[in-house]
A protein has these predicted regions:
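An acidic, Gly/Ser/Thr/Pro-rich helix-cap/linker signature
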Residues: 2-114, 245-251, 258-263
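Short, functionally critical alpha-helical segments immediately adjacent to catalytic or ligand/cofactor-binding
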Residues: 116-131, 191-196
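Residues that scaffold the ATP/ADP-binding catalytic core of kinase and kinase-like folds
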Residues: 133, 152-153, 205
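Substrate-binding/active-site groove segments that recognize
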Residues: 138-159, 173, 178
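Short polybasic/polar patches that bind polyanions
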Residues: 109-112, 151, 207
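Catalytic and substrate-binding regions of cell-wall glycan-acting enzymes that process beta-1,4-linked
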Residues: 43-86, 141-144, 148, 158, ...
Length: 264
């Protein structure tokens, strides 16, 4: 009789232990009540949040097919920081996407006609996508040409007319300028940097530092971050959902009348 009791207790104990182990591996559930009064179970198991810019995605980032130097912690950290600055959570506007839809149909075929990589269209957004007008240095238009440079590449700039504000004509001028810069540097990232600060300055830094890799050159803060901005602009325009952008409805839109016109 005692043996039967011991065997019965042992079986019960084994079943309890097995049930405990099974419960330990089950996801936690919580009850929730819907409007119609029915009760459903909701899985509350915690998951690891995704990184803002996974390393696998970082390897795919590029400007005009020139990629980031992988394994460079400084470059990767800077890229993540600039990308974060262009998320919807930071900008709170879809103005960039509206400008891209308005400008790119005019810009893209012109760049292609001059053999310029399509990614250079993002210079227009970086220069004028969030804020248009004339800079304190005198640069104006979507491509932010200085008066002297604009005239060199065929634009009329005087008291009566300023073709820097003509999307089509200024894009043709920009394409000519970019193509000329490529003949000097033979690197699209260096061309972008030279567009920002001037070819003389970039050439001087290349000679001084004996370095012709944009990502390894020590440049001033604005130029040193310029290509990172272009890559970030490309990312948020081509992959809007990844960076928090939603359809225009409900967004805090930046309302400003477009001052530029495209002429055929």
């Amino acid at each position: 009789m005692i043996k039967k009791h011991i065997v019965r207790c042992t079986v019960i104990l084994v079943l309890l232990v097995a049930a405990g182990v099974f419960a330990y591996h089950m996801p936690t559930t919580a009850k929730s009540h819907s409007e119609n009064g029915t009760t459903t179970l909701k899985d509350t198991t915690q998951t690891t949040p995704k990184a803002a810019v996974p390393l696998s995605h970082m390897a795919q980032l590029n400007f005009a097919d020139e990629t980031l130097p992988l394994g460079d912690a400084r470059v990767e950290r800077k890229m993540k920081m600039v990308l974060t600055a262009y998320t919807y959570g930071r900008l709170q506007t879809n103005r960039l996407h509206r400008k891209a839809a308005e400008w790119f149909p005019v810009i893209e075929p012109i760049l292609a006609a001059y053999g310029i990589p399509d990614d250079f269209k993002y210079i227009a957004l970086v220069e004028s996508g969030l804020q248009e007008g004339t800079s304190h240095k005198g640069a104006s238009g979507i491509w932010q040409f200085m008066p002297g440079t604009a005239r060199i590449y065929g634009l009329k700039v005087n008291r009566k007319i300023d073709e820097r504000k003509n999307l089509r004509k200024s894009t043709i001028a920009a394409a000519k300028y970019i193509k000329e810069l490529y003949h000097i540097f033979d690197s699209w990232t260096l061309v972008a940097a030279a567009y920002n600060v001037g070819d003389v300055h970039i050439q001087k830094q290349i000679n001084k530092q004996n370095q012709d890799n944009y990502f390894k050159l020590k440049l001033n803060r604005e130029t040193g971050g310029y290509v990172y901005k272009l890559i970030s602009m490309k990312e948020v325009v081509e992959n809007p959902a990844r960076y928090g952008y939603r359809p225009a409805k409900g967004l805090i839109a930046y309302r400003q009348e477009n001052k530029f016109k495209a002429y055929n």
